[in-house]
Amino acid sequence: MPGRKFADGEVVRGRWPGSSLYYEVEILSHDSTSQLYTVKYKDGTELELKESDIKPLKSFKQRKSGSTSSSPSRRRSSRSRSRSRSRSPGRAPKGSRRSVSASYQADAKEKEMRREILQVKLTPLVLKPFANSVSVYNGEPEHMEKSATPPKNKQERVILSTEDSYIATQYSLRPRREEVKPKHRVRGTNLVTRGPVPLGTFQVTTPQRRDLEFGGVPGALLIMLGLPACVFLLLLQCAQKDPGLLQFPPPLPALRELWEARVCGVYLLWFFLQALFSLLPVGKVVEGTPLVDGRRLKYRLNGLYAFILTSAAVGTAVFWDIELYYLYTHFLQFALAAIVFSVVLSVYLYARSLKVPRDELSPASSGNAVYDFFIGRELNPRIGAFDLKFFCELRPGLIGWVVINLVMLLAEMKVQERSAPSLAMTLVNSFQLLYVVDALWFEEALLTTMDIIHDGFGFMLAFGDLVWVPFTYSLQAFYLVNHPQDLSWPLTSVIIALKLCGYVIFRCANSQKNAFRKNPTDPKLAHLKTIPTSTWKSLLVSGWWGFVRHPNYLGDLIMALAWSLPCGFNHILPYFYVIYFTALLIHREARDEHQCRRKYGLAWEKYCQRVPYRIFPYIY
C-alpha cells in the first residue's frame, strides 16, 4: 500500500472540488484504506481530498517567481513596431524594463487571483441567513421574510421527510470564469437513470460514518445474540397457560426437535414464491431517490398484486382442506428456520459487499467487519433487476404476518371449539390487516425511508424483516389462541375509535408529506407554510407536520395500542409490541434528528423552535 506524502499539521494547497482553484489548507488526518486526506480550509470547512488534489506550497511559490511571461496581447509582435528603433538615453535598459513589467504583471495576476478567490462563496452545510424566513410555500413571503432567497426551481421545493436521510454535501459556487460541470459515471444498464443536477451545485461523496450507532461493535454483538433469544423467549412464554412475568418459560426443546427439514422446505417455498410474485411484470415502475453519484434505481411496485395472489393461494389451500394448523403446532420450528435463513442471507450479503465499489456502500458502514455485518455494507444489493432489500422490506415478512394471523384465527376456533372466531381475534386480525394493506398500497413511500436510503442491507434488516416482524408482530393473535378474551361492546367501540384515530393521523400525515414531495405547487397545499433550506428543500412547518415533528410515528403508536387492547389486561405480554415499538420510534427519531441537524443546519434549528414536540404533544 503506498505511503502518505503529506504529514498531519502540514500546510499545503488543496484543490476545491469541482474547480481548478487551490486554497491553503491544513492536513488533519490520512485514511490509509481510502487514501484520502482530511483537510481543513481557512473558513473552517473540512473535506476529504485525494493526494492528487493536494500540492505543496513551494510549487506555487516557484511558479509565481518564475512566471515572467507577458500577457498574450503583448507576446504578439505589433506590425507598427516590427522594426527596431533607437532608444532614448534617458530610457532604462531593456532588461530592467522587462523585469519591472514582469513584476507588475505578476502583482496584477496575484490581485486578480485574490479577486477570483473572494468571489467563491463557500456554504458547506451552513444555511444562508434566513432571517425569520418562514414563508407560505407557494405564495408570497411574509413581510419579515423578504430577504429569504427562494429556490431557483419550484420543483426542488420538496418536503423534508425525516426518514429521507440521503446525505449530499452541497456547496454554492459563483466562479467568474469557470463553470462547474457534474461528472456522471457511465453504466450500461437500463435500470438506472440520472436525475438533473442543479446548476451551481455539486455533490461530494459522503465519507463513511465514524460515529457508530446502536452502541458500536459491542452493541451490535449484543443485539445479534439477543434478538434470536428474545424471539424464542416470547413464543415460549406466550404458549404457556400463565404467561405472567413471574413465570419462567419452559426450556427450549432439543435441537433435533426444533430442526425439521419439512419446515425448512415450506419456509423456502414461501420465500421464493414471494420472490417470484415480485418479478411479475405487473405494477408501475418508479425511480428511487438519487444516489451519491446521481443515479436513480428503478423499482417495480407490485406488492398489492403479490398480496392478492398470496390470498388466492391461501384461500385455495383452505378450500382443499390443506392443514394450515401445521404452522401453529410448529411455530417454534418455523421461527428457527427463519432465523437460520436470515443469518445465511446476511453472510451472503456481507460477502458480496466486499467486491462492490465504494460509492455503492451504505453511509452507515464503518469498516469494522462485525458492525458492518450487522448494519449492512452494501446500500442496494441487487441480483439483476431483483432488489434484495426492497423485496425483503415488505413481502416475506409483512405478508407472512397476515398469513400467520389467519392461521392463529383458525387455530383459536379449533382449540377453543368455536364455530366463529372471537371478537377480540377478529379485531386484531382486522386492524393488522388494514395496516399491512395500507403499507402495500402506498409501497412507493418506502423508497424515502431511512431503511432504503441510508442503512445497508445486513443482519439488522434481514433479521427484522424475515423473523422479527412476522413472529413477534403476530404475538397478539398467538396469545388469544390459548387466552380467550370477552369484550363488551362499549369497550369494543372505544378500541375501534382509537384505531381509527391513529390511522387517520398516520395516513393523513404521510399523504400530506407525499403530496408535497410530488407536487409542491399543488393548490390544495397552498395553505401550508415552510422553512426554506440551503439544499433547495423546504421543511413543512404547518399542517400535520406543524403539530409534532413526527405525526406519522404518533399515529403508528396509537394503532399499536389499539390492536393490543383486545387482549385484555391480565398480562403484559400482549403489550410487548407497544413497548418495543415506542422504544424503536424514539430511537429512530433520535437518528432522524441527528441527520437532519447535520443536513439542514440552522433551518432545522428554526423548525425545532416552531415545532418543539417530537412525537407526543406536550410530553416529548
UniProtKB/Swiss-Prot annotation:
The modification Phosphothreonine is found at residues 123, 205. The keyword Nuclease does not apply. Glycans are attached at residue 96. Pathway: Steroid biosynthesis; cholesterol biosynthesis. It is a multi-pass membrane protein. Disulfide bonds: none annotated. The chain crosses the membrane at residues 216-236, 263-283, 304-324, 331-351, 452-472, 486-506, 525-547, 566-586. The modification N6-acetyllysine is found at residues 55, 599, 606. It holds the Pfam family LBR_tudor. Its EC number is 1.3.1.70. Catalyzes the reduction of the C14-unsaturated bond of lanosterol, as part of the metabolic pathway leading to cholesterol biosynthesis. Plays a critical role in myeloid cell cholesterol biosynthesis which is essential to both myeloid cell growth and functional maturation. Mediates the activation of NADPH oxidases, perhaps by maintaining critical levels of cholesterol required for membrane lipid raft formation during neutrophil differentiation. Anchors the lamina and the heterochromatin to the inner nuclear membrane. This is Delta(14)-sterol reductase LBR. The gene is Lbr.
